[in-house]
């Protein structure tokens, strides 16, 4: 399991710890990842995703998982999230035609 957010693509960065004497030692900056269950309104299902805390705030800000995925570009999404996005697009298109 890699340390990458499934919704934003946020991953591990590397850098230096810098002491007061300006000594540098390598370190890793890890993303704040959480296992969360998000509900898709269009598909009426729950999905368990590994997302960063910042992505979770963005999902809430945009109005839920469906709205976030529809607005997100496919390049930053994981393969699971891309598949989920395509299913949501298909379901909303079917609902628009039926209405």
From Swiss-Prot:
It holds the Pfam family Ribosomal_L28. This is Large ribosomal subunit protein bL28. NCBIfam families: L28. Gene3D superfamilies: Ribosomal protein L28/L24 (2.30.170.40). The gene is rpmB. GO terms for cellular component: cytosolic large ribosomal subunit. It comes from the Bacteria. Keywords: Ribonucleoprotein, Ribosomal protein.
